Amino acid sequence: MHTVSELRTFRSAAAVAGMSQEDIEDFVDHIAANPDDGEEIVGTGGCRKVRFAIRGNNKGKSGGVRTITFYTGNDLPVFLITVFSKSQKVNLTKAERNSLKKLTTAIVDEYAMRVQALAAGGERA
């Protein structure tokens, strides 16, 4: 199982998409065990779109939510970036993909700085 980290905006996006607390917990369990699940989104720096069925909609994955995750496998957690229902959005725009690329670069850079600081005996972690 991998560590999962939610970005600050993930919970509010999950509520808008209709996910319950149980849905979120189910998804976290799923993605912790399967961090490479979903299809990679070109131009995002490695984000993946994971289709996930939510409780009570009886439509399976196709009627569920689309969660955007980021996982590099380089000792970083799996990041839950955002989530949306199919009725909210089908695909990401070019501008959204570009924003995700900047975000994923910042995540990797920040973690690299933290590791270097820890290796040097610093306090930043």
Predicted regions and their residues:
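Arg/Lys-rich, positively charged N-terminal/basic patches that mediate binding to nucleic acids
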Residues: M1-D23, A119-A125
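Polybasic/polar functional segments that serve as interface/processing modules
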Residues: V28-H30, K101
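Basic/aromatic recognition patch in beta-strand/loop cores that engages polyanionic ligands
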Residues: G38-V83, Q88
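Sequence/structural signature of beta-propeller domains
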Residues: A17, Q21-D26, A33, G46-R48, ...
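Short, surface-exposed helix-loop/turn micro-motifs enriched in polar/charged residues
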Residues: H2, D23, E39-V42, L92
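Enriched for short, Lys/Arg-rich terminal
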Residues: Y71-A125
